[in-house]
Amino acid sequence: MKTLSKLTTALLAAGALCGGVYAASNGLDARAETRPLFNDKRPIITPQSLPGGAYDPNGDFSNDPNPKIEHLFLPWEDVDLSTLSTADEYARKRGRSLLITVEPWSWARNWRVTPADLLSGILAGHYDSNMTAICSAAAKLNTPVTIRWAQEMDEKNGQFTWAYWKADDYVKAYKHAVTVCRKSLPTAKYMWSPMGKDGLEAYYPGDSFVDVVGLSVFGYQPFDLRKLGRDSTFVEATKPGYDRVKRFKKPIVIAELGYQGNEAYVHGWAEEANKPHSEFPNLQAVVYFNDREVYPWPDGLGRPDWRVATPPLLN
């Protein structure tokens, strides 16, 4: 579970550790020659690479100079916002901006309301104080902030309450949340972040409510073999969603990237993920999701482990 307390623990632990700085040429540390190359799954970074980032509760990227974005996840209920200042200082020291995903629910599943009740509550202003609290806290931070609200609304796998809404209702709720947040946090960028599915355009809230478009891209070899009968590539997995959102003429960021498979599969994805591709001229950055999947994948494929190292790297 993506808890802010887990993040804070990781940040404090990482700050207490010491070790080699990762080489900018390939993202691997000086000890890499003593272990198999892809025990460390981090995207390979070169001077030509797109900016990278990470959601990193295990601290594997703590001493890595390559990431430029620190990704946080917050529920808008039951969250200790005082720890945002810890994350801010951690990111500032490393020259990173903050991408804050705000999920409009509680992470305690038995406390969640129905999709209809959540929607009506948002539109009636019952959750304005939740959004205001987060955005007011973010306004006090020293690092640049991007707010990503209610992500992957076009993914109909039952994971997110807001994904049950009709598209026009999602648009109303998104506009309401951003309008509330802007009152406290006018300097932030606002990210609209679909999964990348067919029909996502119906959820687009309009240019004035979107500064950057996010996408989620995952490569899971068992799923590929089940559905395609072969391995997929990063470009192949990214292209459908990219092609659907490029019409909006906004900067595009892969807000969540993950991959799991055998060594050859991981090698291919790690090598390609942050490389500039002619197919994706508007792609501005790629942010890795460094944790286990929260929900099982279909067809009994379990929960993919996107973590770049197990056990976590001690940088």
Annotate each PLM feature.
Residues E33-S129, Y259-N262, V287-Y288:
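N-terminal substrate-binding region of glycoside hydrolase catalytic domains
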Residues G19-P36:
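C-terminal region of N-terminal signal peptides and the immediate post-cleavage residues
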Residues P36-N39, P43, T146, Q151, ...:
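Substrate-binding cleft of secreted/luminal carbohydrate-active enzymes
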Residues N58-N66, S82-I100, A133-N142, Y204-S208, ...:
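Acidic (Asp/Glu)-rich catalytic clusters
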Residues Y174, V178-L200, P251-N262, Y288:
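Aromatic-lined carbohydrate-recognition surfaces of secreted/lumenal glycan-active proteins
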Residues T86-E103, P205-S208, L215-N262:
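Glycoside hydrolase catalytic-domain groove-lining segments
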